[in-house]
Amino acid sequence: MQNYPLLSLINSPEDLRLLNKDQLPQVCNELREYLLESVSRTSGHLASGLGTVELTVALHYIFKTPFDQLIWDVGHQAYPHKILTGRRERMTTIRQKDGIHPFPWREESEFDVLSVGHSSTSISAGLGIAIAAEKENAGRKIICVIGDGAITAGMAFEAMNHAGALHTDMLVILNDNEMSISENVGGLNNHLARIFSGSIYSSLRDSSKKILDTMPPIKNFMKKTEEHMKGVISPISTLFEELGFNYIGPIDGHNIEELIATLSNMKTLKGPQFLHIRTKKGKGYTPAEQDPIGFHGVPKFDYHTGQLPKSTATPTYSQIFGEWLCETAEQDEKLIGITPAMREGSGMVEFSNRFPDQYFDVAIAEQHAVTLAAGLAIGGYKPVVAIYSTFLQRAYDQVIHDVAIQNLPVLFAIDRAGIVGADGPTHQGAFDLSFLRCIPNLIIMAPSNENECRLMLHTGYCCGKPAAVRYPRGNAIGVELEPLRKLEIGKSNLVRQGQDIAILNFGTLLPNALDVAEKLNATVVDMRFVKPLDHERINELAKTHRTLVTLEENTIQGGAGSAVSEVVNIQQHHVNILHLGLPDEFVAQGTQQEVLKELKLDATGIEEQIKNFLRIA
C-alpha cells in the first residue's frame, strides 16, 4: 500500500472523515488507481465504479454512515464503497468462491443497507427505510444512488411518486453517466445548484410556502415559476418536481469540491430531495472511457495496456442465439427481436446493426418487453424476447396474463439459465423451469448443446404458440451445426442404452450424464422438452429400469424432475426416482465449474449421489 499513502489510512468512513477537504482529491486519485489495479487482477465490474469515485468519497465524508444509510441501486458502481468500508484488503476475492460479494450485501457489512443485484429497487426500499426511521424518530438520513439506466424502470417512478406524495425525508441521487438525459453541466449549473440547495434559499422557500398556503392561487403560480426557472437550466427537472421532489442539478459528479458543498447543503433539507449528477463511466482510465460497455464487466487484464483477452474458445450460447436470429431474420421480415437493455449480453449486437427496423431495446423494462411482444404477435408479427433467466422473474404476470392466456406466438430466448457463476445469488438462473412449467399453453425446451439450441429456437419460432428455450451462460461444446429443422414437439432423444438405471437429462449437463453412464452402464435420454414431457418415453423407462435419475440445472423444487415424478405417480409405476439439480437455497458465487462441483453436479458428484441413492434404495 506504499503507493496509496492516504487510502492506506482509511479502514472505515470514520477515518475518511478525519481528513481535511483539501486531501480528498488525492484520496479520489488513489481510490481510482486502487480500484483499477485490483479489478484488473481479479475480474469484475470496472467502468461503473471508476465513474462513482468522487461521489462515493463525498457521500461517506458528508454523511455519518452507517448511521446515515446509503443504498446503491444494482451495485455495479459500489466497488469504491466496499473499498472505503473496511473491505479493501479483500477486494482481490470479489466475485470468487468464498470471497466478498460482487454487489452490496447485508450479511457482509453494516454499511450495505440493502442487498442488491437487480435494478431499480433502491428508491422503493429507501422510502420504506425512511418511513421506518421517521416513525422511530431516528434522525438518520437515507440516500439512494441510482443510475440513468435503472431510473428508466417503472418501479423507480412508482417509488418516487409515492415518496413525493408522502413528503418523506430522503435523498435520491441520479448518477447520469450517459448523454441521454442531460448535457447541461458546467460552472453555471454548479453555481445554481449551490444556490438552490443552500440554507438561505431553502429557508426563504419554506417560509414562503407557509405564507402562501393561505393563498393557493399565488402559491401555485410561484411553484410553477420556480419549476420553470429550474426547467430552463435542466428540462428534466420538471419531471421530478412534478413527482414531488426538490430537484437540484445537474452538477459535475467528478468535482469533489462541488459535491461536498452541494451534499452539505442538501443534508439539512426536509422532504424528498433529488440531486442530478453527471459522471463519465470509466472516468480516469482511457480504455474504459472509450469503451465503457466493453469495460463494464471485465476478466483479468493488463491495465497498463488496456488490452482485454480475446477468447479463442467455442462460441457462447448467446452468440449461437444471435447467429440464429440473424439467419432467421434474413428469411422472415416479420421477426422482431426484443431485449430489455441486454443487447451485448444476449448476443444481439450484429442483429441490431443489420436489422434495425426489426429490433427493439426497451431499456430496463422487462414487463413492457413481454407485453410489447404480445401486442406485436396480435399485430401479426413474430416476436422473440431475449432475456436473462433471473430477469424474466420480473415479468412473470405478463408471461401469464398477456402471452400465455391468449396463446400468442411469442418466443422467449432465456439466456443465463442455470448456474451463472461469479455474480452470485441474484443472478443464478435457478427458478425458470419451476415458475414456467405450471403455465398452460407454454412449450419449454432445454437444449443439451448448441446444435440442439438452434433447432429448439427454430421449433419454438415456428410452433405458433408461446414457447421458451433456456440455455446457459458461457461457451458451447463445439458440436457440428445442422441445417435448421423443426423438432417433434414433446419427443425426447435416446442417447445411450444401458440397464437398471436411466438418467433423464434436461439441458447442458448431458456430457456429465454420459460420463457417469459409462461407469454405471446406465441408459441416458436427452429429454429436450420440459413441457410437454415425453410421457411415452418416461413410461417405457419406468417399466424397464429399476431407478430413474432426473438431472437438471434448475432448483429441484417444482422443476423438470418433479414433472417426471408426476407422470410416474399418475401411472403408478413402482420405480425409484432420484432428483438431481439445484438445492433449496440461494446459490453463492464462484465459477460455474466450482459451483457445480460443490453442488455435486459434476460427473464425480453425480456418480456419488447415484451410488449413495442405490445403497438406500
Swiss-Prot record:
Annotated catalysed reactions: D-glyceraldehyde 3-phosphate + pyruvate + H(+) = 1-deoxy-D-xylulose 5-phosphate + CO2
Q: Where does thiamine diphosphate bind?
A: H76, G117, H118, S119, G149, A150, N177, Y285, E366
* One Gene Ontology molecular-function label: thiamine pyrophosphate binding
The pathway is: Metabolic intermediate biosynthesis; 1-deoxy-D-xylulose 5-phosphate biosynthesis; 1-deoxy-D-xylulose 5-phosphate from D-glyceraldehyde 3-phosphate and pyruvate: step 1/1
User: What keyword terms does UniProt attach to this protein?
Assistant: Isoprene biosynthesis, Magnesium, Metal-binding, Thiamine biosynthesis, Thiamine pyrophosphate, Transferase
One Pfam family of this chain: Transketolase_C
Establish whether keyword Magnesium is in the entry. yes
Instruction: Kindly list the cofactors needed.
Output: Mg(2+); thiamine diphosphate
Q: What is its EC number?
A: 2.2.1.7
Query: What domain of life does the native source organism fall in?
Result: Bacteria
Q: Which residues bind Mg(2+)?
A: D148, N177
Provide the top EC class: transferase
Bound how, and how many: what does the cofactor note say?
Answer: Binds 1 Mg(2+) ion per subunit. Binds 1 thiamine pyrophosphate per subunit.
Q: Which GO terms describe its cellular component?
A: cytosol
Please give a single GO biological process term from the UniProt record. terpenoid biosynthetic process
InterPro entries, from UniProt? Dxylulose-5-P_synthase (IPR005477), THDP-binding (IPR029061), Transketo_C/PFOR_II (IPR009014), Transketolase-like_Pyr-bd (IPR005475), Transketolase_BS (IPR020826), Transketolase_C (IPR033248), Transketolase_CS (IPR049557)
Tell me yes or no: is Magnesium among this UniProt entry's keywords: yes
This chain's function reads: Catalyzes the acyloin condensation reaction between C atoms 2 and 3 of pyruvate and glyceraldehyde 3-phosphate to yield 1-deoxy-D-xylulose-5-phosphate (DXP).
UniProt similarity note: Belongs to the transketolase family. DXPS subfamily.
The protein's assembly and partners = Homodimer.
* Listed name of the protein: 1-deoxy-D-xylulose-5-phosphate synthase
Q: Which organism is it from?
A: Mannheimia succiniciproducens (strain KCTC 0769BP / MBEL55E)
Gene this chain is encoded by: dxs
